[in-house]
Amino acid sequence: FHGHTKDSKKNIKK
């Protein structure tokens, strides 16, 4: 998951 946002921390596996 290449997105340095708050969502990237909860969706780090995707």
From Swiss-Prot:
Superkingdom, taxonomy of origin: Bacteria
A GO MF label: rRNA binding
Keywords: Ribonucleoprotein, Ribosomal protein, RNA-binding, rRNA-binding
An example Gene Ontology CC term for this record: ribonucleoprotein complex
Ribosomal protein recorded as keyword: yes
Protein family according to the UniProt entry: Belongs to the universal ribosomal protein uS19 family.
Task of the protein: Protein S19 forms a complex with S13 that binds strongly to the 16S ribosomal RNA.
Descriptive protein name: Small ribosomal subunit protein uS19
Organism for this UniProt entry: Pigeon pea witches'-broom phytoplasma
Gene of this entry: rpsS
